[in-house]
């Protein structure tokens, strides 16, 4: 699990560098992706081999004002597997719920995804697979005449 999780985290961090996010923003998104990938491996494939697909999309909007430029980046990340699927998505998303209590799983994966991302949507069908779509909006303000950018709150 850890090698696949690390690869996913590095790939997503690499994707994010083009929009110059803060270290905290990168870590939040990497944590959410890590949880989604771990869920696919542990629960979707039940520790058997399988493919976990990660798609990253970026939509950028630039709004120019009198003395500043606002950069808005909407990041969408989709983590998909062809694993066993989830019978009850609502139950699976409850904090502390785990389908593998024997493995000392905390059942906090979806809770962490929801904490670190703006939206988390789950689609799943038993025996077909699961798709987790997460979004996060990042903003930064560039003062006109300033070569550097300042992140907005």
Predicted regions: what is each one?
Residues 9-34:
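Conserved short strand/loop->alpha-helix "switch" segment adjacent to the catalytic nucleotide/phosphoryl-transfer site
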Residues 1-5:
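STAS-typified acidic loop motif
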Residues 35, 39:
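Conserved polar catalytic motif of the HATPase_c/GHKL fold
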Residues 40-153:
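Conserved beta-strand-loop-beta-strand hairpin that lines the nucleotide-binding pocket
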Residues 7-10, 91:
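Generic recognition of short, well-ordered alpha-helical segments
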């Amino acid at each position: 699990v850890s090698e696949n999780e690390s690869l996913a985290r590095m790939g997503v961090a690499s994707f994010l560098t083009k929009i110059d996010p803060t270290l905290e923003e990168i870590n939040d998104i990497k944590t959410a992706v890590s949880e989604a990938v771990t869920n696919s491996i542990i629960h979707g494939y039940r520790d058997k081999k399988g493919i976990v697909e990660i798609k990253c999309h970026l939509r950028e909007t630039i709004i120019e004002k009198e003395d500043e430029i606002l950069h808005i980046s909407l990041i969408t990340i989709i983590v998909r597997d062809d694993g066993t699927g989830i019978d009850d998505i609502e139950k699976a998303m409850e904090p502390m719920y785990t389908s593998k209590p024997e493995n000392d799983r905390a059942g906090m994966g979806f809770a962490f995804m929801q904490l670190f991302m703006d939206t988390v949507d789950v689609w799943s069908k038993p025996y077909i697979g699961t798709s987790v779509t997460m979004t996060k909006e990042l903003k930064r303000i560039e003062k006109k005449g300033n070569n550097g950018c300042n992140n907005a709150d």
